[in-house]
Regions:
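Acidic, metal/ion-coordinating pockets
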Residues: 5-302, 378, 383-386, 551-555
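Sec-dependent signal peptide cleavage junction
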Residues: 2-13, 612-623, 642-644
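C-terminal membrane-anchoring or membrane-association module
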Residues: 628-646
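Hydrophobic alpha-helical scaffolding
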Residues: 37-40, 101, 182-190, 260-261, ...
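Acidic/histidine-rich, surface-exposed loop or edge segments in extracytoplasmic proteins
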Residues: 21-35, 345-349, 353-374, 427, ...
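C-terminal low-complexity, Ser/Thr- and acidic/Pro-rich disordered "stalk" regions positioned immediately N-terminal
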Residues: 582-620
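Feature captures C-terminal
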Residues: 13-18, 28-34, 42, 121-130, ...
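A short C-terminal boundary segment appended to hydrolase-like catalytic domains
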Residues: 154-162, 274-416, 564-588
Length: 646
């Protein structure tokens, strides 16, 4: 009840529950902005600016998963760096998150206890209502009581009341089934919608919650929302989209569904309106709350909004403070870890003209598959072979692919550091295994070779233009790359012979598996290891649409680290990845025959048989001469016999 109120109390008080939210940040963590493009990353320092700029501090700061895994900054500390920032970056930090499918990459126990990396007394909660683990309990929800005050502007009297809000989290059970078995050993997933509905009911009936918000990492947010009962809003992750729609839930009531892109490019602010019915009295015992989720308001903020706010010196000060006191110390730790020596390389693995990457972007699409000397295969997709070899070693798959756009560096002979590996694979992409037929795989490789062939023609024209005195940029502007040039595939698990004189669909002369030496069978189904990006590119590679996802693994960078850390990794990689050679797709005509030996001068030899034998060589003259000689010998022998008989 209120003890400070005097004056005219309204029958209904309008208010909002505000939730600032993120999803799928994938280890992105600090602010950046490109004014020319109008794009950038909000980061935790930019988030602090957005948070502080609100007229009233948001009631909740929530995240919908795929948070602790992706960028090397996150993976090298197994998510601890991100967990620390979530907890301490500004104010009280995040209230809660829910696991995304990639967050399990460090194992279920490490994920469940991720909040243990907190340096505060009130860490964020890790919510997964539908997960059950043998080694510990997953939290299903959190509850927060919001103290509200209504003020009478005329009398300056106030009326105090409370709104109870529950937050429940879960991950789509179908995502759990795609995870590596060893990472989720002892953990099972029940129906996410069922678990959320049960917890929402408990929160309302047992805890007296007026508002229930769900955070969930789910395959399809709108389909998922339609299954929810007793939930006012769904803050979703996984689809990497900007979403703001009403969906009718299983209880017939609107569920506001929101999602804020990915990679910290966006931050959402959801306002859920309610009406607090005072019943016209100062007592609160019989007061009721009505929530109008369908009338919710969603605002989406980007790095540009942060940039605009930085015109205020106070906001710039907040950004600088978070960066210097929270982010920089972790950056320093990351830099030190990047200098760790993982192993040593006896050879250069070229990314372009050299291991350093001179013309790497150009060469990995072109002459890596078309050396100037057809007999020189020393540069043929060497860094691509290392990458594919690491995928094969990690997963045990039959085949592997990596697109040119995903490769950003090579390996020079000598010590290989963690930083070198990050430079090769900087995007935080993950390794996945899929199943597809040999025919679909070969079709994709053939189209990749066509893209490479077209890129090679562009590159030759560009180089000629540069030789004529123009800049490389002018050359690329005049002789442009194909838009899909980054889709050229490096591949592993097969020994391949390519005939560049043939057209698309006919260039692969032979392909044998490194596993067992058998020919790649178009009718057989194989397991293919790939990064999670290129396998979804069904525009350039339509046959990928026929593939079936099998298992998710760790980051591409982690696969490289694991391979290079092994003794004798280069020979292992070579045996797994296979070779590329160049030959002819045409079969030579029947070779010229070896001349037949002279027939024996045996009385049992017949002219008919000898003539046929010689004629088969194609030398009719020789056959005729042979027949005459043998005929003459027969005549002489008969003459001798006749004389003796005489």
């Amino acid at each position: 009840p209120s003890f400070a109120f005097a004056g005219s109390l309204p029958g209904v008080i309008n208010g909002d529950v505000t939730v600032m939210h993120t999803n799928d940040i994938h280890g992105s963590y600090k602010y950046s902005y490109n004014a020319g493009k109008g794009t950038g990353t909000v980061g935790f320092d930019g988030l602090a600016v957005l948070y502080s700029a609100q007229s009233n501090a948001p009631d909740f700061l929530l995240d919908a998963g795929d948070t602790f895994h992706g960028q090397s900054f996150a993976t090298m500390s197994e998510g601890k760096s991100i967990a620390e920032l979530m907890d301490t970056f500004y104010a009280d930090g995040y209230d809660a998150t829910t696991p995304g499918n990639h967050d399990w990459s460090y194992g279920a126990d490490k994920l469940r206890t991720m909040t243990g990396n907190s340096t505060t007394s009130s860490p964020f909660a890790m919510l997964c209502a539908n997960a059950t683990s043998a080694n510990g309990t997953w939290s299903a929800s959190i509850l927060k009581t919001l103290n509200r005050t209504w003020k009478d502007n005329e009398s300056a009297s106030t009326f105090n009341y409370q709104i109870k809000v529950g937050v429940v989290g879960a991950m789509d059970e179908s995502l759990g089934s795609s995870l590596r078995a060893d990472l989720v050993a002892g953990t099972s997933f029940s129906s996410a919608a069922g678990a959320i509905n049960a917890e929402a009911k408990r929160l309302r009936e047992d805890e007296g919650c007026n508002v229930v918000v769900c955070i969930a990492h789910t395959l399809n947010a709108k389909t998922f929302a339609a299954q929810l009962d007793g939930v006012d809003a769904l803050i979703a992750g996984h689809e990497h989209v900007n979403l703001d729609e009403n969906v009718t839930g299983a209880d017939g009531k609107p569920v506001r569904v929101v999602e804020a892109g990915s990679a910290f490019a966006e931050v959402g602010l959801l306002s859920i309106p309610y009406e607090y019915d005072t019943k016209g009295t100062e007592t609160t015992d019989d007061d009721t709350v009505s929530v109008y989720a369908g009338d919710s308001d969603e605002k989406l903020y980007t790095a540009k909004d942060v940039n605009d706010l930085l015109a205020d010196p106070n906001n710039q000060s907040i950004l600088n403070d978070v960066h210097s006191t929270k982010i920089k110390p972790l950056d320093d730790d990351f830099e030190a870890a990047s200098n760790e020596v993982l192993g040593a390389s006896a050879a250069d693995y070229f990314y372009g003209e050299d291991a350093a990457g001179t013309h790497g972007w150009e060469m990995v699409r072109t002459t890596d598959f078309r050396p100037n000397n057809p007999d020189d295969t020393t540069k043929a997709q060497t860094i691509g072979h290392v990458i594919c070899g690491s995928y094969l070693d990690l997963t045990g798959a039959d085949l592997a692919i990596e697109n040119a756009g995903g490769i950003r560096g090579g390996i020079a002979a000598g010590n290989v550091t963690a930083g070198n590996v990050i430079a090769i694979s900087p995007y935080g992409n993950t390794v996945e295994t899929w199943t597809m037929t040999g025919a679909d795989f070969l079709t994709a490789l053939e189209h990749s070779l066509q893209i490479s062939d077209d890129c090679n023609k562009s590159y030759e024209l560009q180089q000629a233009y540069v030789a004529a005195g123009h800049t490389e940029q002018e050359a690329q502007d005049k002789y442009k790359w194909r838009d899909d040039s980054g889709s050229v595939l490096s591949f592993g698990g097969i020994n391949v012979t390519i005939d560049w004189t043939q057209s698309e669909g006919k260039r692969i002369v032979s392909a044998t598996l490194t596993k067992d030496g058998t020919a790649l069978d178009p009718a057989k189904t194989y397991t293919v290891a790939t990064n999670n990006y290129i396998i979804t590119n069904t525009t350039d590679f339509p046959t990928f649409a026929n593939a079936t996802k099998y298992t998710e693994w760790g980051t591409c960078e982690a696969a490289l680290r694991a391979l290079i850390g092994q003794s004798g990794w280069e020979s292992k990689m070579a045996s797994l990845a296979g070779t590329v050679s160049f030959g002819s797709a045409t079969v030579d005509p029947t070779p010229a025959p070896t001349p037949a030996p002279s027939p024996k001068t045996d009385t049992k030899v017949t002219t008919k048989k000898t003539t046929v034998k010689l004629a088969a060589t194609g030398d009719r003259t020789l056959a005729a001469v042979g027949a005459c000689l043998i005929g003459g010998i027969v005549v002489i022998i008969l003459g001798i016999i006749w004389k003796r008989r005489r």
